[in-house]
């Protein structure tokens, strides 16, 4: 049962990430969508981690949804992609802002529910 909950949550999270990317990044040359979904995922996972949830609920929302929503691999490829087209400063800003905002969002989420 837990595996099915993770799969369902993952499908919903990945679909949310895909739709966010289709809508947001169609208007920008900077990886805004990946930044947004990763920070949102950190906030949600922080909220879930601080809350008293059943194992099944955490599997659905934490492991599944947040796991499908967030994407470290796309973050890495987009960072390198900016470097490849000689946009070093935007790449560095993207990396630093992503890590800082993700940590801050996770901390905030945890603080709000613990």
Curated annotation (Swiss-Prot):
GO biological process: cellular detoxification of fluoride
GO cellular component: plasma membrane
Notes on how activity is controlled: Na(+) is not transported, but it plays an essential structural role and its presence is essential for fluoride channel function.
Reactions this protein catalyses: fluoride(in) = fluoride(out)
Main location class: membrane
UniProt-annotated binding residues for Na(+): 67, 70
Transmembrane portions of the chain: 30-50, 57-77, 88-108
Membrane-topology annotation of the record: Multi-pass membrane protein
Coiled coil, from the record: none
Keywords assigned by UniProt, alphabetized: Cell membrane, Ion channel, Ion transport, Membrane, Metal-binding, Sodium, Transmembrane, Transmembrane helix, Transport
Protein family per UniProt: Belongs to the fluoride channel Fluc/FEX (TC 1.A.43) family.
NCBIfam families membership: crcB, PRK14211.1
Function, as annotated: Fluoride-specific ion channel. Important for reducing fluoride concentration in the cell, thus reducing its toxicity.
The protein's name in its UniProt record: Fluoride-specific ion channel FluC 2
Organism: Rhodococcus jostii (strain RHA1)
């Amino acid at each position: 049962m837990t595996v099915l909950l993770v799969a369902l949550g993952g499908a919903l999270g990945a679909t949310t990430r895909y739709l966010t990317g289709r809508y947001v990044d169609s208007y920008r040359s900077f990886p805004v969508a990946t930044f947004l979904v990763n920070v949102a995922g950190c906030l949600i996972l922080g909220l879930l981690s601080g809350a008293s949830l059943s194992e099944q609920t955490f599997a659905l929302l934490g492991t599944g949804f947040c796991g499908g929503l967030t994407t470290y691999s796309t973050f890495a490829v987009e960072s390198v992609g900016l470097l490849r087209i000689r946009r070093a400063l935007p790449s560095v800003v993207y990396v630093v802002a992503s890590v800082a905002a993700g940590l801050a969002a996770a901390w905030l989420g945890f603080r709000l529910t613990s």
